[in-house]
Each structure stands twice: as structure tokens, then as C-alpha cells.
Amino acid sequence: MIRRQFLKNSLGAATAAALSGCGTKDQRVQLTFGSYADPGVDILKDEFLPEFEKATGIATEWVEADFSGWLQKALNDGETKAGAFDIYVMDDLWVPRFAGAGYLANLEELGFRPDADFLPTAIDLGCWPPKNGLRQPGVDAAAKPTLFSLPLVSDVQILFYRRDIFGASPPASWDDIRRVASQKSNPGKRQYGWVTRGARGNPVMNSFFVLLHDFGGAEFGENWKVTFNSPQAVEALEFYLSLLPYEPEGVAEFDSDQEGETLLQGSAFAATIWTGWCRQTDDPSRSRVVNKIDFCVPPRKINRVAKLGLFMTGVAASAPHKAEAVEFLKWFTRSDVQIRFARAGGIPFKMSAFRDQEARTKSRWLDAILEAMTVGVPSPRTSDWSKVEDILGTHLNLALLDKGNAKRHLDNAAAEATAFLKSAGYHAG
């Protein structure tokens, strides 16, 4: 019988095991996966790792911790070359940091060749240096983009909206969302036109990202000049703040859980949310609005974009079982496996899986996710983005608490971010 271990929140055990000797010659190879805990990977680890084991005879071990705990352990493993893990599960934001520091193996050198069925926006996130856009200081402008990471589970922010409130057609504009909110919100009965993640740092930045880009703004211009205090960005934040009267009290402290639960309990008409919440909307044990929520790409102002946020994976540069790790990547990224993954309720990263009729019937949100992935925009591809995001997200949170003064808060964020970037070697202007 094939055996697989799940060691949740026990990363120390994995490190100790890696240092404790090699075992006997007859012992099967065991791939050690390191990941942060998230329901988005449950189908993979619960259903597809056992299938991989059965198909290949390679055992797997899934080591899991909270988001920040796993990030620190993975960084330590990469820096020390301890070899405690074969495969890292990463937020797509981590790819520039891990690849740039040499913590990931070059997948091209290991023989991985992506086929044309990959969604371009998904596979491109695994390249370093990035295929498009700015390159951070120290990265040769002539360096060829190289594949260091692959998509593992697709994720993107889409608009969840109440069909019983908006009607058969999705809101055509952001003004439509605000108009319906102003007409139909009833805070006394806990009926709100909008809900958002407003907590400082990454949560509020994720919420603001789509509006920033939809209104024609961007984080950076030429030579990493900070532009998130441009007139377009100020207009976007002013609109974001104009929704506050139609939101629950305390949204400046909301993270994803509070945002999603407000929608599932029937208290909000719309929100931009990650796709991991899709299945829950139709689960009677979790949702009071079963079959009342539909999904689409957020509406257009000047642009129409969605925020990418994929689960990515890569082979650790110090992995003891690189060949078997690549065997897993080749297996899981096969189109037939991705189709089965989509039919099981996973969010795939291959076009054929998104277009599979059985998968589309079982998961009615796949069409919206595919459209959103097609127009998706990632966070800026620099290992220093997390610091800039924290700066901007802190000032966005202050704007929510202040309920106004959009330009002042964005100017303050821009000044602080510019100072940081210049200290880190960016031209920033």
C-alpha cells in the first residue's frame, strides 16, 4: 500500500528528517512538498498526490504551515541549501525573490518544456527575469527570461455579484455598482452594496489593485518612477472611498475571511474576491445565497483587468530528488491531468481544461475565471514589491480610516516608497 504523510505545522520535522541519513537502498524515493496552508491546494494534496503515487511509485510528503511561517522556512532552506524540500509551493509574488536569489532550479536545464496549452498569463509568471515590463536593479537588461517556476493552481480576483440584485446582466460599469449600492443598501438590515478587504498592507492593496488599473493607473512608470499617486490613481481611490457609506462598519480591519463571509451570508451585493470562494457560494452548508451569485471580470473604466494571484511551484535548487520532482511537474501539468483536476473542482491553468464541457458544467465559474486570467495583471515583478506593497497598503488603510483625503495619502505613500526604492538601488524617477 502506498503511504503518504501529512505533517501540518511541523516544518521542523521535515528538516530533521532531511539531515538524518539516507535509509536503505530499497527505500522508495519520497518527494517532500513544502506549502502554506490554504484550501486552494486541498484537491491537489488530497486527491491528486495519491493518484501520482499510484501512477509512478514515488511517495510524497506534504509539509504545511501558515503563510508567513512557510515563507520564512522556505527562504531559510533556500539560503542554507539544507535540502529539506524537493518542491516549494509559492505565492506568485515570491517567484522574483526565490528565482533571483538562486533558490529555484532552472526547469529548462532539468528538461521541462511547456506546451502551447498553458495559459500565457499563468506560465509567464514562472519566468525570471520577467518576460515583460521593468527589470529590477542588478538584472541584466539583455538576460533571457528563463523558466524557474510553474503554475500549480490558478487564482485571480473576479467580481462576485448578486444576480437577484443586479438582474440577469452583470454591472456594466463601476458607476453601476455604486448606483445600485446607493439605491438598495440598508445598513439597518445588514444589506450592503459593497464589501472590501481594508486591512493594512497586502489585503487593502489587493482590493485597490483592480480599481487602480481599471482607472488607467499603475504602480510604476519608466525607471521605476512611482506613479500610484497619479491623477488616475487619485480618481480610483476617491471612487473606492465613495463606496464606504454602503459597506459594513469596520471594513478597514477586514481581511479575506470577513469579506467572503459577508458575501456568503447575503449581506453584500458585490465584491472582487479570489476564486477560492466560488465553490462556497453554492454550498448550502456555507452560503445563504446559493445560486444567487454570478461571476465576471470586474467592469471597465478605462481598462478592464483582473488581479492575478496564482499558486506557483518550483524545484528547490538544493532538492535531493530533482529528477522525481520534475517527473511530478510533467505529470501534473499534462492536459489530461489538468482536465481531471478541473472536473474535480480545481482551478486549472491549461486552456483545454477550462474548455472541458464536464468541468464547465460542474464549476459554472470557470468561464469567468478563464476570461479574467486572459486579461489578468500580476503584481510588479520585483523582489522588493512586498515592501512597496506594505507601504502603499498602510497609507490606503489610513485613507479608509480617514474616509477621504485620497491625494494626500497617496502622495505620502509615494514619497515613502520612492525613498525606499532609491535606498535599494532603483532610479525611481
Write out the residue ranges for each language-model feature:
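Extracytoplasmic/periplasmic solute-binding protein
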Residues: 136-152, 157, 176-226, 232, ...
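Short, solvent-exposed loop/beta-turn-alpha elements that line the ligand-binding surface or hinge
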Residues: 109-120, 195-199, 215-236, 283-288, ...
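Periplasmic-binding protein-like
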Residues: 43-44, 187, 331-351
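Glycine-centered hinge/linker elements that transmit conformational signals in sensory
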Residues: 180-185, 222-253, 294, 298
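Long, aromatic- and glycine/proline-rich binding clefts that accommodate carbohydrate-like moieties
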Residues: 28, 121, 125, 291-296, ...
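Hinge/lid segment of periplasmic solute-binding proteins
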Residues: 92-156, 176, 290-296, 358-362
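Conserved N-terminal structural module of periplasmic/extracytoplasmic solute-binding proteins
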Residues: 2-103, 252, 300-303, 323-324, ...
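A bilobed periplasmic-binding-protein/Venus flytrap-type ligand-binding module shared by bacterial periplasmic
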Residues: 160-164, 308-322
